[in-house]
């Protein structure tokens, strides 16, 4: 007879657990606000023995944040659950994804959802057949492309493998070590260059150490969502500069800070130049200088600025993303020493009209300042996810 072993109502039937937790944990996004721990467990226990389950809640309101985690006793149970997609709980289709290990949270592409795999470290004797033979166990392969020099035809030592689903790629990355013909290979998620630029890495929507779409905060709060970490007086793309940031930071309009440094898409002034036709010393591109675009405002950020969380405030809701600087994990603040993916906080919702602003933006006073609170967009707080 199974015995209850923790406050979340999780059970342990004495089954020996030998695999790392990272291989047995599943992130569940897009949960209905009515879904409880018991409801989540009741659905997913059809595919295996669940040893831990939690629906993440706002610590103040106790309202569901729209996502949770389940941990199975064996990794193959994750495969069973993923093979049974789509999953519908309380009338809502949810989005399960293998949880990203805590130590990889800082990696900008760790939580990216992609179907293509980069395989490096290949020798000349590694051909398409051996790659297919090895990786077919993870999922259905669509194509294998071993890259060769256009002029000489010589193999360049790497290849791209595309699957019909994102889950095989996530599973391969979690396994860490892969060897073919006694050669250890370097496997990574294949991210298009333009997507890497958006997620951090020296360009749009982020910069060095930006962590992708908000280096230090959760799409907002502290450092600038959709922008860089401490990108003050520097010139950030899509947010960051001068402490402000887009999508729900205290100040900043979809890019651009309150002052000091300039960035793209509606800078308020300051030194340096940014993209989209910004000019140093004051005016930013796309209706800069004073009022902010997409809703104007001198210091209040459109799309849910001034501390309020755009797109649903502190509640995570259905608009979660995992590809920004880490992906799904929980923090120890929620009990049981579990790492957490998105920080708490909240307050205020985006897309709310306000009386502040009146700049030259696309809509004057519309879409300004999403209510009070210190939480950032999509979950406030001051932790990296």
Curated annotation (Swiss-Prot):
Keywords: Cytoplasm, Nucleus, Repeat, Ribonucleoprotein, RNA-binding. Pfam families: RRM_1. It is found in: Nucleus; Cytoplasm. It comes from the Eukaryota. GO terms for cellular component: chromatin; cytoplasm; heterochromatin; nucleoplasm; nucleus; omega speckle; polytene chromosome puff; ribonucleoprotein complex. Residues 24-101, 115-192 form the RRM domain. Residues 192-289, 305-385 are annotated as: Disordered. Residues 199-289, 305-317, 344-362, 369-385 have a biased composition (Gly residues). One of its GO terms (molecular function) is mRNA binding. Transmembrane segments: none annotated. Residues 319-336 have a biased composition (Polar residues). GO terms for biological process: compound eye morphogenesis; female gonad development; mitotic cell cycle; positive regulation of mRNA splicing, via spliceosome; regulation of alternative mRNA splicing, via spliceosome; response to heat; response to starvation. Its main location: nucleus. This protein is a component of ribonucleosomes. Could be needed to organize a concentration gradient of a dorsalizing morphogen (Dm) originating in the germinal vesicle. This is Heterogeneous nuclear ribonucleoprotein 87F. The lineage of its organism: Eukaryota, Metazoa, Ecdysozoa, Arthropoda, Hexapoda. The gene is Hrb87F.
